[in-house]
Structures are given as structure tokens and as C-alpha cells.
């Protein structure tokens, strides 16, 4: 029996499985939306992976995790995590807009989620802390990243219309 009032995302596909036709086809059979953890990329793979997901699953996808680390000016060692790395906090903002503009251009993407609200704890030396958050460890919003994300998010529907021309 199926509850048609629920949205089923299934398990989040990450790593190699998200590139495997059989896995994506199986997810498409049961999921309403394919959930993807999408890391280590400057640009979404519009003509390869994203096109494959559309063909294999015949369902939209949601990027359930992504982030970019600023490695030179975050006061964290940034040795952990799968996020794409750029030199500075300002470049994290550019990376956000670049990546999400690509997702808006994809006809089968229904949204995205930045992985983490706050950076990893910089005092926890056991876990190799990284710059993953929208906020630093003093609860200060990264201003440039916030501005660029807000600017893109407020204009998302107009941008979709532009890409649909």
C-alpha cells in the first residue's frame, strides 16, 4: 500500500553509487525524488551525471548535501570532508553561486541543501576540523557567502525562467 500524501526521497546516493545506472534506476523505481550528496565538484555535471540521472531514474533530484571550504582564511585545518576547496571565504561565495546556477540550469533539479549550519569545532583536535558552515565558531555569519547565497536564492525563480528560454 502506498501513501500518496508522502514524499519519498529514499537513501541519499553518494560516492560511486550515484554514477551507477542500476542503482539510480532502482532509486527511480521507488523514490519520488532522487537524493544526491554532491561533493568535490566546481560545476554540476550537466551533460554527464545529471543527464544520466534524468534518463535512468525519470525522476527529479535534490542535492541533499554540498559545501565548499575556504582553506586559507578559516583558522581550521580543513583536512576532513568531501567539500570542494577554494582559497578564501569570498571564493566560497563565488563557488556557491556558480554551483547553484548550474543546478538551476538543470531541468531535473528541484533544490539543494548546504551541508552544515556551522563550521566544525576548531578546538576538537581529534577530528580535523573544516570550514563547512554558513556560520563560523563564534556564531558569525560568513558575510560574503551569505550575501551571494541570499542574492541567488531570492532570484531563483527568475533564473529558472531565464534558463528555460
Where are these predicted regions, by residue range?
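Glycoside hydrolase catalytic-domain groove-lining segments
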Residues: 3-81, 97-101
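Aromatic-rich peripheral "rim/lid" segments of glycoside hydrolase catalytic domains that contact
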Residues: 115-165
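Short, low-complexity, polar/charged sequence segments that are solvent-exposed and flexible
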Residues: 30, 53-56, 81-84, 131-136, ...
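Short, exposed beta-strand "edge-strand" segments with a Pro/Gly-rich flavor and a Y/T-containing core
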Residues: 1, 81-87, 139-140
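C-terminal structured "cap/appendage" subdomains that terminate the fold
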Residues: 82-134
Amino acid at each position: 500500500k502506498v501513501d500518496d500524501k508522502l514524499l519519498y526521497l529514499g537513501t541519499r546516493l553518494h560516492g560511486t553509487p550515484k554514477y551507477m545506472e542500476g542503482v539510480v534506476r532502482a532509486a527511480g523505481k521507488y523514490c519520488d525524488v532522487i537524493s544526491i550528496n554532491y561533493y568535490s565538484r566546481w560545476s554540476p555535471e550537466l551533460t554527464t551525471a545529471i543527464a544520466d540521472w534524468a534518463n535512468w531514474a525519470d525522476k527529479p533530484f535534490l542535492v541533499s548535501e554540498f559545501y565548499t571550504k575556504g582553506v586559507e582564511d578559516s583558522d581550521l585545518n580543513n583536512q576532513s570532508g568531501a567539500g570542494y576547496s577554494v582559497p578564501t571565504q569570498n571564493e566560497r561565495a563565488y563557488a556557491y553561486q556558480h554551483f547553484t546556477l548550474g543546478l538551476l540550469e538543470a531541468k531535473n533539479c528541484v533544490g539543494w541543501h548546504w551541508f552544515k549550519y556551522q563550521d566544525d569545532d576548531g578546538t576538537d583536535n581529534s577530528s580535523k576540523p573544516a570550514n563547512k558552515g554558513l556560520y563560523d565558531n563564534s556564531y558569525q555569519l560568513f558575510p560574503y557567502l551569505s550575501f551571494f547565497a541570499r542574492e541567488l536564492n531570492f532570484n531563483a525563480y527568475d533564473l529558472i525562467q531565464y534558463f528555460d528560454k
